[in-house]
Amino acid sequence: MKFKAIVIDIDGTITCENRELHLGAVKKIRILKVPVVLATGNILCYARTASKLIGLDGAVIAENGGAVTVRYDLNGTFEESLEECEKAFSFLSEYFKLTKLDPFYRKTEIALRRDFNLEKARTLLETQPFDVEMVDTKYAVHIKSTRINKGSGLRKLAEIMGLEAEDFVAIGDSENDIEMFEAAGFGIAVANGDERIKEAANYVTEASYGDGAVEAIEFLESNGWI
């Protein structure tokens, strides 16, 4: 079994607990001989900046799969519009005081501060015809299209790169990484990940956050899989 690339989440996976990039994980990623794609629920410019700081080529999946790009000098490909998300936001605003995060930069989804009852909001949303869902990344709650996720983003990016999604190992920590694990050939959850992502993983590290990412890569190397 040999994999051709790695797709890895940012926050909670290659960061410290305080969200700073984990220097050990960055160093490990820089010396890899396979392509590394960053995948995040955050905005495209954030993902590109992280890719640049780490020393990668700029291949990123942003906005939970809604935006992808393979190089810094190319415009991002956006897979959905905000129309349905805005309808859902307006509906939920009748019941909760919601605060948007990065509203001027997000093109395919709405991110909200995590200061409202998410389960109640999900229940209310189920009564409506909107083709959206709410995903908690532990850093924000995202209102996004049901057709878009990190898995669909990975398949799109893999196609552009001339690869299959199954050629990738996926590494992550949150429920928004589940579809990415399902699309990839192998999934690794870091120890601080939530229970749903651990259940979806093929392997769970003993270490957390960036230390877990280092452990994941060393596990792959020790098995000769990358």
Curated annotation (Swiss-Prot):
Binding site for substrate: 150
GO molecular function: magnesium ion binding; phosphatase activity; phosphoglycolate phosphatase activity
InterPro entries (alphabetical): HAD-like_sf, HAD-SF_hydro_IIB, HAD_sf, PGPase
Active site: 9
Keywords linked to the UniProt accession: Carbohydrate metabolism, Hydrolase, Magnesium, Metal-binding
Binding site for Mg(2+): 9, 11, 173, 177
Annotated Gene Ontology cellular component terms: cytosol
Database matches in Gene3D superfamilies: 3.90.1070.10, HAD superfamily/HAD-like
Cofactor(s) required for function per UniProt: Mg(2+)
Known EC number: 3.1.3.18
Catalytic activity: 2-phosphoglycolate + H2O = glycolate + phosphate
Top-rank taxon, per record: Archaea
Sequence similarity: Belongs to the archaeal SPP-like hydrolase family.
PANTHER family in alphabetical order: HAD SUPERFAMILY HYDROLASE-LIKE, TYPE 3, PHOSPHOSERINE PHOSPHATASE
Function as written in the Swiss-Prot or TrEMBL entry: Catalyzes the dephosphorylation of 2-phosphoglycolate.
Record's protein name: Phosphoglycolate phosphatase
Organism name: Methanosarcina acetivorans (strain ATCC 35395 / DSM 2834 / JCM 12185 / C2A)
Higher taxonomy: Archaea, Methanobacteriati, Methanobacteriota, Stenosarchaea group, Methanomicrobia
